[in-house]
Design a protein with these regions (language model features):
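Ligand-binding clefts/hinges and TM-proximal coupling segments of bilobed small-molecule sensing domains
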Residues: 22-25, 30, 155-172, 248-287
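Bilobed "Venus flytrap"/periplasmic-binding protein-like clamshell domains
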Residues: 41-49, 60-73, 105, 126-181, ...
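Short helix-initiation/N-cap motifs at beta->coil->alpha
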Residues: 65, 80-91, 135-136, 176-188, ...
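Acidic, polar ligand-binding/catalytic clefts
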Residues: 69, 73, 78-142, 278, ...
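A ligand-binding cleft/hinge motif common to bilobed small-molecule-binding domains
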Residues: 87-91, 104-113, 159-163, 191-224
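Periplasmic-binding protein-like
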Residues: 122-129, 209-246, 264-287
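Extracytoplasmic small-molecule ligand-binding "clamshell" domains
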Residues: 23-104, 251, 260
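Extended ligand-binding regions for polar small-molecule ligands
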Residues: 23, 66-74, 133-134, 141-142, ...
Length: 287
């Protein structure tokens, strides 16, 4: 397996401007369990447009930002997003440097055994290939013996590894997996011809295509749907956020946040979850 270093737009460990808390209410939690008094610090990887990304003015925006700001406001806290490489988020949470992970993180039982996870939405993976490749593609197995790009530390990396192992057991060449720090660098590698195909989020694939990046074709969507989850270390903080999330779902605030993005919302009630969960029942995205 090969690994390329960080290139392009990834900004590691750079803070986004904090969203202001309401001035006429009392914070629901103090320090501890919060890492800093009056502030909710969340790790985010702002390279997953339109869910979380950096706009032309250098601000981190997107669905996850809208969600985090709404949660913090109801908790009477300032929201502080820390731009963090995805693979380092769980260690940072365990070390107490951040309060939560709010970064398009897929729920898995393995992750839920390490940190407290609260599923709330759902998404899936897409396979993208150079535009000139018109072959029908039904999964990563197509890339037997070929270079294939994925983001480091993600479910799509594990999916690619599992497919590669299955190919080897069948006596076929494994997938030549290349890992990258962000979806943006995955696409850069695809554009440069370093890989023959790649996994990126289905929403990201359609977003980049709408933005005029026409060097790739979306060969497959809806692969391996997973729930997305917030992640915490401290039970009191997790419970407080869960209470706010259920309140937001009941009063319609969740729908107002998610609807503009066309993003799938799980029905709730929301809770800290462990072990296997059902595959999310969300309509496939087509644009």
């Amino acid at each position: 397996m090969k690994r390329l270093g960080l290139i392009g737009l990834m900004l590691a460990l750079v803070g986004a401007p904090a969203a202001m808390a309401q001035t006429n209410c009392t914070p629901k939690l103090g320090h501890p369990p919060l890492a800093r008094k009056g502030m909710l610090i969340a790790a985010i990887n702002p390279t997953v447009a339109p869910i979380q990304y950096i706009d032309d003015d250098g601000n981190i925006i997107g669905l996850d930002v809208d969600l985090g700001n709404a949660i913090a406001e109801r908790m009477c806290l300032k929201m502080d997003f820390q731009s963090t490489q995805f693979a380092t988020m769980i260690p940072a949470l365990k070390e107490g440097r951040i309060d939560m992970i709010n970064s398009f993180m897929f729920y898995t039982p393995e992750r839920a055994s390490q940190v407290l996870m609260v599923p709330y939405g759902a998404s899936s993976m897409a396979i993208v290939v150079p535009k000139k490749n018109t072959d029908p593609i039904s999964g990563p197995e197509y890339f037997s013996g070929k270079p294939f790009g994925v983001e480091l530390g993600t479910v799509d990396l594990k999916d690619a590894q599992a497919a590669s192992e299955a190919l080897q057991k069948a006596g076929k060449p494994p997938i030549d997996i290349h890992t990258f720090d962000t979806y943006a660098t995955v696409l850069q590698a695809l554009s440069a011809g370093q890989v023959d195909g790649a996994f990126i989020g289905t929403e990201q694939a359609f977003y980049y295509r709408k933005k005029g990046q026409d060097f790739f074709r979306i060969a497959l969507t809806g692969y391996d749907p997973h729930a997305e989850a917030l992640a915490f270390k401290d039970p009191a903080l997790a419970d407080a956020v869960v209470a706010v999330m259920n309140e937001m779902h009941a009063d319609g605030a969740f729908d107002k946040i998610f609807k503009p993005y066309g993003h799938c919302v799980l029905p709730g009630p929301y809770k800290v979850t462990t072990g296997p969960i059902p595959t999310p029942d969300c309509p496939p995205q087509t644009q």
